[in-house]
């Protein structure tokens, strides 16, 4: 074989071992001893990981590239002088997309993808705005961005109706057209509180999704019993439509409320167990995002049930939240401090669980084939300046190398392509 690359002295958490990794023709040819790697290749470039962490890249399972950097461009963040107000932010979002040209949207998305790749992110699911006024303008801009960065990054595009799929027939037409243009999934948002018709909204999600044979990823922000009822009904519709394993509920704040109620002796039954039963039966996946995850989100219980959970950055310096540096370790650090008061997620097992959300959990949620460091898988590799996932999070470790399909695309936190 003609050799491409050897990564020597790579620590793989999945094996808890330091190995050499041989890469040829964009795929992993050998993992193991120096002799095995040398035998697989002939005259490769060598990278010495020095015993540090190597993994197959972060997965940003929930992000909005479409409004990325909308808070940037001035000395201090724009749209950031008042406390958070959802209604005001929705109005600003509408105004932003109506007034921003497609070229700017594409350029901002590409800039954020390049920033993400430099931080070791190689995969994402991007929720992308549609409504009855802008139609598919934003979708088309993000699809163009996807094409521009395709050599660096894999991204799924979700057609996301911020004001609901029932906000007029034009929205449903925009959703259908978006899927025909190349969007990968249908999005949705709180069926009860946004469009005031829970059942009809969910039915419409599945009607449009099944027409185009695409998966669903819906924002479910509603808390309390309304939120858990929404999740249960989504799960029931998934089973009814044969969509087991094809639906994601993003945010799902109500699960944290259900966990609190389940610990209250005044509450009858087991509210958390009931909704988790429904999600498990329908194989509904979940995403959570560090800017908004409520304390008490029961990600440990989700893991015990085998429910797939990914993590997303959600915002990237945008008009909703000015945070977001496209750096998943930043999100994991925040989560390690806020998820519970006992600092469970600051322990070594807790940090390992958070790391899994950023990597294999997200890969499972997105259905990424060949994700991992095994012979025959695509040579997507990230080398971090940390000896373990735990120290990568706690120390906010630098990214030393990012390798995409066997090609080095970033070194020392900067793109080289």
Predicted regions, residues:
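Divalent metal-coordination and catalytic microenvironments
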Residues: 10, 26, 51, 62, ...
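Active-site gating loops and adjacent loop-to-helix segments of metal-dependent hydrolytic enzymes
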Residues: 69-105, 230-269, 275-278, 282-286, ...
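Alpha-helical scaffold segments that flank or form the walls of functional sites
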Residues: 72-127, 133-148, 174-180
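Metal-coordinating catalytic core of metallo-dependent amide/deamination hydrolases
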Residues: 98-99, 128-260
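His/Asp/Glu-enriched, well-ordered alpha-helical/loop segment
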Residues: 215, 236-247, 299-384
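C-terminal cap of metal-dependent C-N hydrolases
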Residues: 364, 375-417
């Amino acid at each position: 074989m003609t050799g491409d690359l050897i990564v020597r002295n790579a620590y793989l958490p999945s094996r808890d071992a330091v190995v050499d990794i041989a890469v040829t023709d964009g795929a992993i040819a050998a993992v193991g001893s120096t002799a095995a790697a040398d035998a697989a290749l002939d005259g490769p470039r060598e990278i010495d990981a020095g015993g540090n962490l190597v993994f197959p890249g972060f997965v940003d399972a929930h992000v909005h590239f479409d409004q990325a950097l909308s808070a940037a461009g001035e000395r201090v963040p724009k749209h950031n002088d008042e406390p958070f107000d959802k209604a005001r932010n929705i109005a600003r979002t509408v105004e932003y997309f109506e007034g921003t040209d497609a070229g700017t949207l594409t350029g901002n998305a590409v800039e954020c993808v390049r920033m993400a790749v430099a931080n070791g992110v190689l995969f994402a699911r991007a929720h992308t705005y549609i409504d009855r006024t802008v139609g598919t303008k934003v979708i088309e801009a993000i699809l163009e961005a996807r094409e521009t960065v395709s050599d660096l990054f894999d991204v799924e595009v979700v057609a996301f109706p911020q004001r609901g799929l029932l906000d007029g027939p034009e929205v449903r037409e925009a959703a259908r057209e978006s899927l025909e243009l190349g969007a990968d999934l249908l999005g949705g948002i709180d069926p009860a509180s946004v469009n005031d018709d829970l059942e009809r909204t969910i039915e419409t999600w599945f009607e449009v999704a099944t027409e185009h044979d695409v998966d669903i990823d819906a924002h479910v922000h509603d808390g309390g019993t309304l939120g858990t009822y929404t999740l249960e009904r989504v799960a029931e519709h998934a089973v009814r439509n044969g969509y087991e394993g094809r639906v994601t509920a993003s945010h799902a704040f109500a699960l944290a409320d259900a966990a609190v109620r389940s610990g209250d002796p005044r509450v009858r039954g087991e509210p958390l167990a009931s909704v988790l039963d429904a999600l498990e039966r329908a194989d509904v996946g979940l995403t959570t995002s560090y800017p908004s995850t409520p304390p008490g989100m029961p990600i440990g219980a989700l893991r015990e049930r085998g429910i797939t959970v990914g993590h997303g950055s959600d915002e990237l310096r945008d008009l909703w939240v000015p945070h977001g540096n496209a750096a998943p370790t930043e999100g994991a650090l925040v989560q390690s401090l806020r998820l519970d008061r006992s600092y469970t997620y600051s322990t070594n097992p807790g940090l390992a669980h958070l790391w899994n959300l950023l990597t294999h959990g997200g890969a499972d949620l997105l259905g990424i084939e060949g994700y991992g460091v095994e012979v025959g898988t695509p040579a997507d590799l990230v080398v971090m300046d940390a000896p373990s996932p735990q120290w990568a999070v706690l120390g906010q470790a630098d990214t030393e190398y990012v390798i995409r399909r066997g090609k080095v695309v970033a070194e020392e936190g900067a793109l080289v392509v």
